[in-house]
């Protein structure tokens, strides 16, 4: 399955729209829809059909899956066919009961048995009591045989001595067409059984009638009637094939939509899951939840807030661990900067594994310092034990680096237990951090510790309950802060033998590393020295399996809602990691999704009105009504076929009636006009634009569609009615019956065929897929009502004369001709008719078929509305997933630079994998608030320090808001360290200060290359002005101490599992020293930086040489400002937060 692991790419825009297109062959816009690797081949098993109607999916596995899906969809329609069969049995029972006699007993018994069998089959199918294999493969043929047997039984038993070529032809036509719209079989078997049924029915009727007529055989009349039957059957089969094709095409599109929607949702869900995992690897879950909740607030709600949102929480009784690499300077001198970063990356990745094992929350990585907390966010009683075990494991882990690198590196670990304020400050580049006096103590515990030992405070000692042997730490002798505060310290000697047992009892082994190795396993040590690959990426010799925290991140999270389905999409995404290579796996997932979708009863009574089936929600009904049905032109073409077959049948019955030819020509022309107007919207390139616009308007306007459909059926009905009324010219009344019936080729020879033509009109009506079932009911009532009116009134004597002649020819008991003009069931003895008069039986047949087709139309509309709701549901789910993905994306890109986040949202990264980029010319800035430490107190008036941090959050947030200015778009906030703000310029890859794709350095002048450094200097000045505005409004006197430098750095991420973006290099070290050795209220730079910035109009004051640790004497300057004429030559002026504009 193709995957796109980036952010909002353009090609996804179409997939989030409400109109999701799927293209099939013969679509006018084929090639526009997204079919990915799926194609539809114009070939199939039914070779008798035109090539464009033979659709087959490629690959074959998908076609097999579709056939299974299609047959499942037709399972309900199989029940419809059972209902049809039951109605036919009821018809036979009524017809026999009305004129009951002893010779009707057999026919009545067979019909009764058939009705019972139909009811049993209905119950078995409805309740799902039959195996699927039987229901889909055996039951359709059983039902076909049962219906065929019932038709022949009725034919043989009910018309035993008076057969005619028209007997049961109407029912045969009805069921042949029903096979195509209900049986869950492929098209070829349906065509075969339909042809077999029609051939056998025709042969049986022809032979039987010929034998009964014997010496009085009317060969031409029988031949014409047999040919009329054939054309009726051919029409039913042709329209049935078209209906099957239309249903197949509709279901294929629904199937492709389901597959592609599943694929899109899996892509989105997987990306959203990656974003969530990445986010939760940087932020604790409770903080991320609160951030997402606030991000979804309306702008009006945000504007009502007096202060910027601060996500800060108090956590008591936690253990804080600080660990620092001793001898890091010696180690850094032994390898290059890139090799050093790679080494740190592998070492800290190992520490992250240990942190997961010992329930630690890694807070930050500061250079070579690693610190974490246990008991946050979820409290643990054994937090102190876990932290000490973590410290011991870190000391042992660094020993392997010491052995392999032959250097004196070691770990100095300090642990303190107390209270912290945990959260994030500012509005950009969020990083979780903790603040409190106890954090400071923990930091000093590390600074006052001894290399290779774990140094703990008295508060931590009080939580241990004797699990470890300790000795006095005497931390005050090595750290003035500890001595000043009078903090007793201890050094862990070694864990007792019971420690392992204690750790097990405390659940440590429950979250051990997946490979089950102990923290000091030597199996992982080679990875710590395999860091000198020339391509700049580090790899471990072993594979990395699923991590505990990754499993935790995948737990149910109410802030990251997934579609509320039994088959959760994140489960699908997890199970189809390599779906592009494993088509079978994706098809299995699709099958599960389709099964679940079918099992969900989407259309319920509470959603739709019972009678009309319209949605109760008017807006939903409007959306459904404008759904475009592209097969409407095909439906009108079926009307043309029906009219053609109608004309052929009527011409065969009465070849001398000129009205037949006139109605056919006029009706066919009118129907062709309607068909062309409907096809114009489907094939816009083949028709004039005005006709296409008119056709499109018809398709999208409900009343116009209904009117167009009514016109088509009205034409069919009127053609039949006009022919029936015109035929009356041959009939001159009962007195001239002999002469009237002697006219060979008259429609009076067999008036039943005009009712069979009405059945074709009913079939044409249900083919109108663009109208609702209520409109179809209206049209079918028009057809049935017109036929019934003519049968019972205009053609009443015609049918009576037909019955009279038929019974007379076969010497059957009958009433006098004058008595036949009014059917009276009260007649007895030999005067009782052996059959129900044709005028009644034909009328009942037409109405019963109308009811059957109406029942089927309701089923089709229910299915159409269900598919519509599924489509809306899929769209809404994709929108929800996409919306959550957008919020996750916003959070992730607010924690990592976008190009870095893209990298980590790709395929799963190994823990030791290093992402890094080298930059030769960037600017680095550190800006601190030295006097904030004096401002911070944890007194109750300040809510334990939270209010002090709230004020710091306002300052940092205002600094962050400066970055929204286009002038500072090339400036990247790296992080905040306490009250120190770190930023860099020029670290955005492939983009220069003007926002265009960068070219080679040789193609740009020095002024162009260092414009970003000037922007960074402007940013530092804007920060000073912003702080001045804050001081004026809050009556404070905070001052910034800023240091800047320029040069080359290595930017990258340490720890693929918990990515920490940072920059390293001598440039960063010097910039940090410029800040720490600077003077409050000033921006200090070295001479090389001053020379470059001076060219941009910045003013400097020479400070002179100062001593910098590790660098010796450096000549420095204070940046005082910029000439007004040179201010922001390439951008607009900057509006400062909290700026008070003087308009006087």
Curated annotation (Swiss-Prot):
Residue list for modification Phosphoserine: 525, 580, 1076
UniProt crosslink position (Glycyl lysine isopeptide (Lys-Gly) (interchain with G-Cter in SUMO3)): 465
Tissue: Detected in zona glomerulosa and zona fasciculata in the adrenal gland (at protein level). Expressed in brain, heart, kidney, liver, lung, pancreas islets, placenta, and skeletal muscle. Detected in testis.
Cofactor note: Binds 2 magnesium ions per subunit. Is also active with manganese (in vitro).
Keyword Nucleotide-binding appears in the UniProt entry: yes
Entry membrane topology: Multi-pass membrane protein
Low complexity bias (residue ranges): 517-527
Subcellular location per the Swiss-Prot or TrEMBL entry: Cell membrane; Cytoplasm; Cell projection, Cilium; Golgi apparatus
Signal peptide, first to last residue: none
Protein activity control: Specifically activated by the G alpha protein GNAL/G(olf) in signaling cascades triggered by odorant receptors. Activated by forskolin. After forskolin treatment, activity is further increased by calcium/calmodulin. In the absence of forskolin, calcium/calmodulin has little effect on enzyme activity.
Post-translational modification: Sumoylated. Sumoylation is required for targeting ot olfactory cilia. N-glycosylated.
Binding site for Mg(2+) 2: 324-325, 368
Region named Disordered: 504-566
Binding site for Mg(2+) 1: 324, 368
Name of this protein: Adenylate cyclase type 3
Native organism: Homo sapiens (Human)
Organism ancestry: Eukaryota, Metazoa, Chordata, Craniata, Vertebrata
Protein encoded by which gene: ADCY3
